[in-house]
Each structure stands twice: as C-alpha cells, then as structure tokens.
Amino acid sequence: MIKIAVAGGVTGGHLYPALAVLKELEKLTPIDVLYFTVSGKLEERVLKDYNYKKVSLKIQGLKRPVYSIENIKRLFKIFNANNIVLKELKKFKPDIVFVTGGYVSYPVGTAAKKLKIPLYIQEQNVIPGLANIKLSSFAKKVFVSFEESKKYFQRDVVVAGNPILICHKENLNFEKKTILIVGGSGGSEFLNSLACKLSNKLKDYHFILSSGRKEVPCKSENLTILDYIENMSDYYSAVSCAITRGGATTVSELIFFDTPSIIIPWEGSTEAHQIENAKQIEKLGLGYVIREKEVNIDEIANKIIELSNRERKGSPKTNPAILIAKEIKNEVLK
C-alpha cells in the first residue's frame, strides 16, 4: 500500500490532474489518501464522492501586487495552515506528498520538506505556477505537461503530459452538429454572452454551454445550459467543436481527445499562462487562438463551420496519468 498526501485544487485545472493520477495509481496498488482542500472551493464539492481522508484549510492566495495590505491577513492564515498541515502529516505518516499547484500546494509542500517526506510535483501550465517553481528546489521529481516547461525547473524533470481524468457517465450521441462552450470551472460571463450570440446566428447547430453558475443573458431552443460538467471527457469526445478558455487542463483534454477548438484565453491569467497554453492548439493544427479584443461573431461562426466539418484524425494516446502513476509506484514500492 502507498500512503499519499495530496494538495491541488481551487480550480478544476489543479484538481482533476491530481484525481486522474490517484485513479490510475489505485489500479496498480492499494492507496490511502489524505487530501488537503481549500475551504469552500471546488474540491470540497467534488471530493464528497471520493473515499479519501480530507483536511480543509482556510487560506487564500496572495493578491497581486504582493505588497498589498490585504496580504498581511492572508499570510497569517497561511502561517496557521502550516501548523495544521504539519500536525496532520505527522499523524497520517504518508510515504510521499503529491502536489499539483495552486496556493494550497505551498504549505503542504514545505511541510513535506520539514518532515523529510519525498515530494512529487505535477505542473499543468507551459509557464509554471509560482508555488510549483518554489517547491521544485527540494522536490524528488517534477512532472511537466509540455517540453517548453523544462527550462523553469532545475531538478529531476519528466515530460509526461497533463493527466486526464476520464470519467464515462453518459453515452452522448448528438443528432445535430454540437458546439461545446466552456468558461472553465468558474465560468465566464464573456463566453456566456458569446454563446447567446452564436446560438442565435447558427440556428442549425446545437450549442451546449457550461455556464459556471454565472448568469446567461438569453434563452434559445438550440442552446442547452449546464451549470457545471464533471464528465468533460464524454463531451469532448462527442461534440463537433469546442470554444474554451486556455487553462492548461482544458487545452490538454482538447489535445487528448483531438477536439477541434477555438481558444479565447482569459486575459487575466497569471503571467499570460492561458495565452501560452493556447498556442499548443495552433501548434498542433487543432484549431485557433483568438484574443478577446479580437473576437468577431462572423469570423467565429465561419471557424465553427470549418472546424465542425473536420474529420478527427487523432491516434489513440496513452493517458499521462498512467505514466505518472507507474513512476510513483515504481519509486515508492522498490
């Protein structure tokens, strides 16, 4: 058995790669999981369906610029979280700690260092997040999703790809050509508005919008609105085309399922992460990247028509989660 403490959440981009690796690791060996969550965030809702031990931390990420007065309060909460994490890790006694980024990873990773527990990191973005870069200086191994990410890390780096959580819940078979619009786990008012305009313009197409519980300013017979989609793999496999933000996990899923795509990166992402991630779609010839300020409804409608008529040519791929799980299992159970 492998006892593993995990941190990675707040957004689906950090949460689902962690769950994908745990799912594959459990196929190889029994596991006992302690998952550190952020109070009130996505992972607390999703992890209700998982039989893992959980510890909720009341912390927030630092605001930018970092010299903000608000950060004094947030640093105090992080300090308190450090003590909680140390206490829980001493009690749980994990064989390894596995983190997938986001601010919850930092107190868990630093506690692993203090307790001399081997630390494994998985990075989703082309440009790594600050927490993972800081933690990598004492990590046993860093798994990255893209070759371009290697230069940011100095220790053992494995280009494994981004783990994909494959979760088959529905056999989807759409009669009409169907366009999926997803604004990330938190939704996007911009993409919600875009879905209204496109569904009105392309009446012969069926649109599915994952709204993130944000307001959708229209109703239309050819627009299906869902608050949130957990089984994204079913949808990416079945739709004709997707319009999404440029989160690393989203981009990796689109590549894995060979889904023709239009990426409209969120301009507020840290250090333009989403723009760099989105470039992978154009690099592979899988679709287009359009900046928000350049969005033109007629142009996007034409691109939808073109992409939805493409024949998918992607060959079967090995889920990076399998590669990472095997690597961890082989190192821990030598």
UniProtKB/Swiss-Prot annotation:
Kindly tell me the pathway this chain contributes to: Cell wall biogenesis; peptidoglycan biosynthesis
Q: CDD domains under this entry?
A: GT28_MurG
Q: Which Pfam families match?
A: Glyco_tran_28_C, Glyco_transf_28
Cross-referenced InterPro entries, in alphabetical order? GlcNAc_MurG, Glyco_trans_28_C, GlycoTrans_28_N
* GO MF term list: UDP-N-acetyl-D-glucosamine:N-acetylmuramoyl-L-alanyl-D-glutamyl-meso-2,6-diaminopimelyl-D-alanyl-D-alanine-diphosphoundecaprenol 4-beta-N-acetylglucosaminlytransferase activity; undecaprenyldiphospho-muramoylpentapeptide beta-N-acetylglucosaminyltransferase activity
Q: Name one GO biological process term.
A: regulation of cell shape
- Write out the residues that bind UDP-N-acetyl-alpha-D-glucosamine: 11-13, 125, 185, 229, 274
In its keyword annotation, does this UniProt entry include Transferase? yes
- Which gene name belongs to this protein? murG
Q: Chief subcellular site?
A: membrane
Where located?
A: Cell inner membrane
Q: Which SUPFAM superfamilies match?
A: UDP-Glycosyltransferase/glycogen phosphorylase
Q: Indicate the segments annotated as coiled coil, or none if absent.
A: none
GO (cellular component) term, any one? plasma membrane
**PANTHER family per the record?**
GLYCOSYLTRANSFERASE (PTHR21015:SF22), UDP-N-ACETYLGLUCOSAMINE--N-ACETYLMURAMYL-(PENTAPEPTIDE) PYROPHOSPHORYL-UNDECAPRENOL N-ACETYLGLUCOSAMINE TRANSFERASE 1 (PTHR21015)
Q: Which domain of life is it from?
A: Bacteria
What membrane topology does this protein have?
Peripheral membrane protein
Family in the record: Belongs to the glycosyltransferase 28 family. MurG subfamily.
For whether the record's keyword set contains Cell inner membrane, the answer is yes
- Cleaved signal peptide residues: none
* Protein name listed in UniProt: UDP-N-acetylglucosamine--N-acetylmuramyl-(pentapeptide) pyrophosphoryl-undecaprenol N-acetylglucosamine transferase
Its EC number is 2.4.1.227
| Catalytic reaction(s) noted | di-trans,octa-cis-undecaprenyl diphospho-N-acetyl-alpha-D-muramoyl-L-alanyl-D-glutamyl-meso-2,6-diaminopimeloyl-D-alanyl-D-alanine + UDP-N-acetyl-alpha-D-glucosamine = di-trans,octa-cis-undecaprenyl diphospho-[N-acetyl-alpha-D-glucosaminyl-(1->4)]-N-acetyl-alpha-D-muramoyl-L-alanyl-D-glutamyl-meso-2,6-diaminopimeloyl-D-alanyl-D-alanine + UDP + H(+)
User: Per its UniProt entry, what is the enzyme's top EC class, as one word?
Assistant: transferase
